[in-house]
Amino acid sequence: MPKFDVAKHDLERLVGKEFTVDEWEDLFLYAKCELDDIWEHEGKIYFKADAKDTNRPDLWSAEGIARQVRWALGMLRGLPRYSIEESNVMVYVDENLKDIRPYGVYAIVEDLELDEEALKQIIQLQEKVALTLGRKRKEVAIGTFDFDKLSPPFYYKAVEPQKIKFIPLNCEREMSADEILEEHEKGKEYGHLIKGRPYYPLLVDSEGNVLSMPPVINSETHGKVTEETKSIFIDITGWNLETIMLALNVIVTALAERGGKIRTVRVIYKDFELKTPDLTPKEFEVDLNYIKRLAGVELTDKDIKDLLERMMYEVDFVDRRVKLRYPAFRNDIMHPRDVLEDVLIAYGYNNIEPEEPELAVQGKGDDFVDFENAIRDLMVGFGLQEVMTFNLTNREAQFDKMNIPEEDIVEIENPISQKWSALRRWLLPSLMEFLSQNTHEEYPQRIFEVGKATLIDESRETKTISESKLVVAIAHPKVTFTEAKEILDSVLRHLGAEYTIREIEYGSFIPGRAGEIIVEGKKVGIIGEIHPQVLENWGVEMPVAAFEIFLRPFYKGSFL
């Protein structure tokens, strides 16, 4: 979880009221933070805040905490209002960045009065947002510049590395792009995000002055922000527009809390145009009875409205529904329980009387888990070895290497590694990878796994369903379809199921040696001999026969 430093005197000038240290310890809870440490320096008190929610970057600074406290105490209510004026400033985005770092969003904040503490908070907030929300700058990189020292319009360009030279931040000499990546502290840390690309991203002004080389480093000589800076130009780049727009909203509203005036920037892409930032409030709706039923305390309609307004919501009641508008610097409201959480934060968890449950509860194993374990025991009894592989995978493993067309799968929005960028929709690719990593071991190799596959299901609240499956793979020089079918036959016989196999053509299997497994007219699995192309894709040197079946249809239907 993010940890960050704030000064007591800075918080209090932003709130407009003084508090004791003990009072601050309670007030931090409104901002989903805890006090991790307290110390004194040159007669001033400082706090180290430990954020308890990685989905609230708006709370990772003195400005965000002070804003939350003002609303929670009822000093202000409802939706925060930020005035935004248009500017004639434009940024042109190079289409050649589409495979390097395709998106940039921008803003200007004017009329600032900065001191040492305010400057520390700006820099710290940038770093925390880029580190956590930005996945160490992979998804979000932030630059801030003294706007009065720049010459708009600006150009977010794709430039050949050998043509790049400028003085990077905290340096005294001009360096080439390669020198920056190899010698500069930030180049060593973040250079891998662009190194080896035919072009590097570069932000320049109309006079060709380099402002930054995102996501690595800013320029030392053009636009460095100091305590004398009155207007800040903000540049945020990344791979996902929604994510970098959120980051921009967090930064500009934090600066607005210090009296800054926000101005928009026109961002010109080849095929579309944006005006950023966009602080249009977001909307959500929740059943009023849901809140009352689950809150655990007696709340009237008026109570709920009051509590939500103290958490920066604009509230309307329509036919027992609560229609809400909330700030654009939040993206964590995804379910009614998120609204309920805010109600209880405003109410105060410390004000809820603990109750000891009256029901005696005795724990027991989940019946379906017991069923899965019985399947495992059965497979071991057939002489197979159990393996346990990861639920996370990638499109290449699920489709390309298995020689089948791509389909919709559940993907991770911000994966740390492309190898682990999706949830698997079937288990056989995982066993093929296992076999590919054990070609040096003795054959035959007869393995199985009981594991989860995640499928798209639009009818469900989460739009997905997790299915338990059994997969078996057998590898040796003389393996055939028949050997896999014999194991399948034994499994289904023990489960009390009659089945048929309907021949199909499927890219993962040899034509004429693949089939769907049908039970009571429904497809429950697939069986076949692995296609030579698939074996080659995985680097598996032996023939393989395999099958995979859903387990849920057989639950409660067998002696197990």
UniProtKB/Swiss-Prot annotation:
Origin superkingdom: Archaea
Top enzyme category: ligase
InterPro entries, per database record: aa-tRNA-synth_II/BPL/LPL, B3/B4_tRNA-bd, DNA-bd_dom_put_sf, Phe-tRNA-ligase_IIc_bsu, Phe-tRNA-synth_IIc_bsu_arc_euk, Phe-tRNA_synthase-like_B3/B4, Phe_tRNA_ligase_beta2_arc, PheRS_beta_core
Keyword annotations from UniProtKB, A to Z: Aminoacyl-tRNA synthetase, ATP-binding, Cytoplasm, Ligase, Magnesium, Metal-binding, Nucleotide-binding, Protein biosynthesis
Reactions that this protein is recorded to catalyse: tRNA(Phe) + L-phenylalanine + ATP = L-phenylalanyl-tRNA(Phe) + AMP + diphosphate + H(+)
Membrane-spanning intervals of the chain: none
Subcellular location: Cytoplasm
Residues reported in the UniProt entry to bind Mg(2+): 332, 338, 341-342
Cofactor: Mg(2+)
GO MF: ATP binding; magnesium ion binding; phenylalanine-tRNA ligase activity; RNA binding
Ranges where the B5 domain occurs: 279-354
SUPFAM superfamilies in the cross-refs: Class II aaRS and biotin synthetases (SSF55681), Putative DNA-binding domain (SSF46955)
GO BP annotation list: phenylalanyl-tRNA aminoacylation
SMART domains: B3_4, B5
EC numbers on record: 6.1.1.20
GO CC annotation, single: phenylalanine-tRNA ligase complex
Family stated for the protein in its record: Belongs to the phenylalanyl-tRNA synthetase beta subunit family. Type 2 subfamily.
Subunit-level organization: Tetramer of two alpha and two beta subunits.
Annotated PANTHER family: PHENYLALANINE--TRNA LIGASE BETA SUBUNIT (PTHR10947:SF0), PHENYLALANYL-TRNA SYNTHETASE BETA CHAIN AND LEUCINE-RICH REPEAT-CONTAINING PROTEIN 47 (PTHR10947)
Family annotation (HAMAP family): Phe_tRNA_synth_beta2 (MF_00284)
Protein name per its UniProtKB record: Phenylalanine--tRNA ligase beta subunit
Origin species: Thermococcus sibiricus (strain DSM 12597 / MM 739)
